[in-house]
Amino acid sequence: MKKVLITGATGFLGKYVVEELSQHGYQVRAFGRNRKVGQSLENSSVAFFQGDLTKQEDLTQACQGMDMVVHAGALSTVWGPWEDFYQTNVLGTKYVLEACREAGMQRLVYVSSPSIYAAPRNQLAIKESDAPQENNLNNYIRSKLVSEKLFKDYPDVPSIILRPRGLFGIGDTSILPRVLKLSQKIGIPLIGDGR
């Protein structure tokens, strides 16, 4: 049975990844800060590990005995000081990479963001190779782009970077609540006949 560590397991995306992998025969170690949420995830194939991305020793310990890591943990907001994003998103990712290298990890899946492509102009048919060298529209975007660049320094860690867009669903505290709040004020217009 494959053993996988999921960072950010107590967050919106992380909880879904924990559930999906545990239902498909993986032994899951759910890494997160929120003990109450983390313990609610526990079952015969899920063990909660309370830890912090900004603490290298937590990640080193959490990676021990694991085959794979899904690094979904991040400070995910568009507001806040650079130092907060740097500590959590950039150094946290570096610590994950270091721990994966030390543990001889078989695979690291890093959850980044398509917002790294965000620009003040329209863009169509964007390719992976179109990733900018820098993007300072906000500190979240900047931290994700800087974090992606770290992977070049770890060619010995088999990894893949995902950039999912617009995640929503049950438990969402970001996108759907905003849409619903707006709809209460102005309604949701139907385009055409709504199809």
Language-model segments: what does each one mean?
Residues 40, 46, 50-91, 99, ...:
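NAD(P)H-binding glycine-rich loop region in Rossmannoid oxidoreductase-like domains
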Residues 31-36, 53:
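N-terminal Rossmann-fold cofactor-binding loop
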Residues 75-76, 114-118, 165-168, 186:
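Active-site segment of SDR-like NAD(P)-dependent oxidoreductases
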Residues 4-24:
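N-terminal Rossmann NAD(P)H-binding glycine-rich loop of SDR-like oxidoreductase domains
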Residues 91-139:
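Conserved Rossmann-fold NAD(P)-dependent oxidoreductase catalytic core, especially the SDR/UDP-sugar
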Residues 157, 168-178:
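Glycine/proline-rich active-site loop of Rossmann-fold NAD(P)-dependent oxidoreductases
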Residues 122-167, 188-191:
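Catalytic helix-loop patch of NAD(P)-dependent Rossmann-fold dehydrogenases
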